[in-house]
Each structure stands twice: as C-alpha cells, then as structure tokens.
C-alpha cells in the first residue's frame, strides 16, 4: 500500500483535503466525493497496475515515458497526476485540464 503522506503531495491544499476533508477554492465542490475516492484508491494500491481498475480511471503513462509520470481521471476535466517510481507515488497533484475549443 502506498499510504499517502504529506511528502507524496505537491500541493498542501490537496493533502489537507485528503487527510482532513478541508475544502479549497481550487477543488470544485462537485469533485469532493469522486476525488476522495480516487485518492483512497491510490493510497490503497499495492502497485501501479491496481489503478487500471476500474476502467474509468483511464490510467495513462504520460510522455515522455521515461519520466514515469502517470495520470488517472477524476472526471472529464480533472486528472490526478503523479510520478510513480520504485513502487512509490510522488508529486501528486490535481490538474484542471484546460480545453482550447
């Protein structure tokens, strides 16, 4: 299990949301439940392949692949991005992807 701690998060507000349920202006209220669930999934995972299920996670290794940076979907707009190396999650953050339509 990864057992997420403060040092695994890039941003303090996301750690405080995960650990204490603190809200923040950077986290939309419609994300609270699903974001908490996704963070729990990451924390409970034994290895990176555990995050392939459910398929709605859309686990993806981002380019360049040698950087070992992954993303999982929170919803259509938001992803959790993190580095996975040596069976450890680091630099975990919430990314509000901006679409240029």
From Swiss-Prot:
Domain of life according to the entry: Bacteria
Q: Which Pfam families match?
A: HigB-like_toxin (PF05015)
Looking up InterPro entries in the UniProt record yields:
HigB-1, RelE/ParE_toxin_dom_sf
- UniProt cross-references to Gene3D superfamilies, sorted A to Z: RelE-like
Q: What name is this protein filed under?
A: Uncharacterized protein HI_1250
Species in which this protein is naturally found = Haemophilus influenzae (strain ATCC 51907 / DSM 11121 / KW20 / Rd)
Q: What is the lineage of its organism?
A: Bacteria, Pseudomonadati, Pseudomonadota, Gammaproteobacteria, Pasteurellales
């Amino acid at each position: 299990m990864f057992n997420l701690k403060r040092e695994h998060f890039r941003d303090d507000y996301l750690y405080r949301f995960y650990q204490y349920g603190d809200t923040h202006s950077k986290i939309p209220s419609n994300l609270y439940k699903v974001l908490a669930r996704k963070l729990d999934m990451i924390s409970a995972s034994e290895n990176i392949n555990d995050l392939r299920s459910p398929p709605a996670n859309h686990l993806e290794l981002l380019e360049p692949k040698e950087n070992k940076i992954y993303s999982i979907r929170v919803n259509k707009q938001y992803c959790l991005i993190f580095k996975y190396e040596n069976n450890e999650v680091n630099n975990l953050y919430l990314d509000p992807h901006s679409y240029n339509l």
